[in-house]
């Protein structure tokens, strides 16, 4: 494989020295970019875009072409590709978000679910990873990703998005055996899927536990974190002569960082409700940290964005082990120039904390 021209993202995850704090942004290839909207219109719909490796590559690279400060690319895909490959029938309702034609409601439903083969059943994702790596030609590392078992399970049991997770939590408490069976099958599927991405060329992977923060502390340990640990234990950790770092991100998980740091991932993602300085004091000896600016700051003017970047950099302090990011994904209404101001500020203001 081509040598990396910029590896500061990987170096920071491994807590090796860097010249400036690396930066990327969740949903950096997305609807806030006019070039993304144009490519999506050409594709016809969101899933057609995800399932076309050439177009998925095109939108993955768009933010890098616009923002030379970006230190990583992230695969353009969706966390719900796994349930779709399990036969749940993913589709998108205008204004409603993702929906499934089939809903999981019993142990029999769960036992009937296959564990997808990444090359046979999700080959379009693996092809996209290979295409992106080829086109990146070593510019920056490529991040692969998956949803966490608990997060995927909520969509499969609810039949789509949910505000209160009533069906998922009812299964968790009424029929924990069924929920554990579903989570175990999803953990196997995620492990296989992420290993497929790593073999195809992903140089780091992130597990998005978007809804882990909806759980009680005890339920989080048993029904979310335990299965992320199972995944991390089964991942390929060395590939193509390099360590493949793993990032765990539980939105709303700031209370549980100590437990998360014991799972074996190189880094933890933080949402904006955490103080990054406190997080570093708690777990910074064991893991790198990624985050954690409130995405809504990007609605403010560039001077305010710069001030918030400066505050977060100062809160983290000197040295490596920090990847700057938002605390969740960028929203569609943000001015692309404000994203550019964010990236510029991170590199300009962070040099003083290194070297």
Swiss-Prot record:
EC class name: lyase
Domain of life: Bacteria
Catalytic activity: uroporphyrinogen III + 4 H(+) = coproporphyrinogen III + 4 CO2
InterPro entries: UROD/MetE-like_sf, Uroporphyrinogen_deCO2ase_HemE, Uroporphyrinogen_deCOase
Protein's cellular compartments: Cytoplasm
PANTHER family: METHYLTETRAHYDROFOLATE:HOMOCYSTEINE METHYLTRANSFERASE RELATED, UROPORPHYRINOGEN DECARBOXYLASE
Name of protein: Uroporphyrinogen decarboxylase
Gene from which this protein is expressed: hemE
């Amino acid at each position: 494989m081509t040598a990396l021209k910029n590896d500061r993202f990987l170096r920071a995850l491994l807590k090796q020295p860097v010249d400036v704090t690396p930066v990327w942004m969740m949903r950096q290839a997305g609807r806030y970019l006019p070039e993304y909207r144009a490519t999506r219109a050409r594709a016809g719909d969101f899933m057609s875009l995800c399932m076309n490796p050439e177009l998925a590559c095109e939108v993955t690279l768009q933010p890098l072409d616009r923002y030379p400060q970006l230190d990583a690319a992230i695969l353009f895909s969706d966390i719900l590709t796994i349930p779709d490959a399990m036969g749940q029938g993913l589709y998108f309702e205008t204004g409603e978000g993702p929906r499934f034609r089939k809903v999981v409601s019993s142990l029999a439903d769960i036992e009937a679910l296959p564990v997808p083969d990444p090359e046979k059943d999700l080959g379009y994702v693996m092809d996209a990873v290979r295409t992106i790596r080829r086109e990146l030609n070593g510019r920056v590392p490529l991040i692969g990703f998956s949803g966490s078992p608990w997060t995927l399970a909520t969509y499969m049991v609810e039949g789509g998005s949910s505000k209160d997770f009533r069906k998922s939590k009812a299964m968790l408490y009424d029929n924990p055996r069924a929920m554990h069976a579903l989570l175990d099958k999803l953990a196997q599927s995620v492990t296989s899927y992420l290993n497929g991405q790593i073999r195809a060329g992903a140089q780091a992977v992130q597990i998005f536990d978007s809804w882990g923060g909806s759980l009680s502390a005890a339920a989080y340990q048993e029904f979310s974190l335990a299965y992320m640990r199972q995944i991390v234990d089964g991942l390929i950790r060395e590939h193509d002569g390099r360590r493949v770092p793993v990032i765990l991100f539980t939105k709303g998980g700031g209370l549980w960082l100590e437990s998360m740091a014991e799972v074996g991932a190189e880094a933890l993602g933080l949402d904006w409700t955490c103080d990054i300085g406190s997080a570093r004091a708690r777990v910074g000896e064991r893991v790198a940290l990624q985050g954690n600016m409130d995405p809504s700051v990007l609605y403010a003017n560039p001077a305010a964005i710069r001030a918030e970047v400066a505050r977060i950099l100062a809160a983290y302090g000197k040295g490596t082990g920090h990847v700057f990011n938002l605390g969740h994904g960028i929203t569609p209404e943000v001015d692309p120039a404000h994203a550019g101001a964010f990236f510029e500020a991170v590199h300009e203001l962070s040099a003083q904390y290194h070297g």
